[in-house]
Amino acid sequence: DKVTCDFMNTSWNGLCMEDQRFQAVSIPMKNTRMTLVLPGKGVSFDQISSTESIREILELCDPECTKWKQGLVKLSLPKLQFQSDMDLIPMLQEMGIRDAFQEEKADFGCIWQENGKETSEPDLYVSQARQAGAVKVDENGCSVASYTEITIKESMMIPDIKMKMKCNRPFIMILSDDQGTPLFAGAVSRIE
């Protein structure tokens, strides 16, 4: 299916390369560069996205790569904007990191501190690991944002003591800092 879209057009004297499999250009930017790789005519995207081809394409990102030639580059590029959101747990498990995600096997004792002192840690485990990113390319340049979020939860052991507390009559409330110093104290005498 063909889609109609606006293209940004530019030309400059810069780095480019071409062989039977693909064309590539290197676009200089402030403190970085963008490399664009386009499959050659009659070459499928799958052919240039094989592991071997990707290794060769990644070599183009090396500033010392000798495959680049200096030339007049005329580029037509559509405006781009896309986002991704990926669950990292399956990939991390495939890399051999498994115990961190299991309540009964995770061991984060080496990083657990309370009030600046090592203590016996609660049962912590990684409940979520995500990475999200966004890329936007337009006339103003390229902007990229990315973040990784790892959520660590405390597994709940069912305690021997059970208590039910319903604050439906006057009660006292005290807010204190982590040193135990009261910051605010008050009494709730009437609930409306």
Write out the residue ranges for each language-model feature:
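Hydrophobic-core positions in well-structured secondary-structure elements of globular domains
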Residues: 1-192
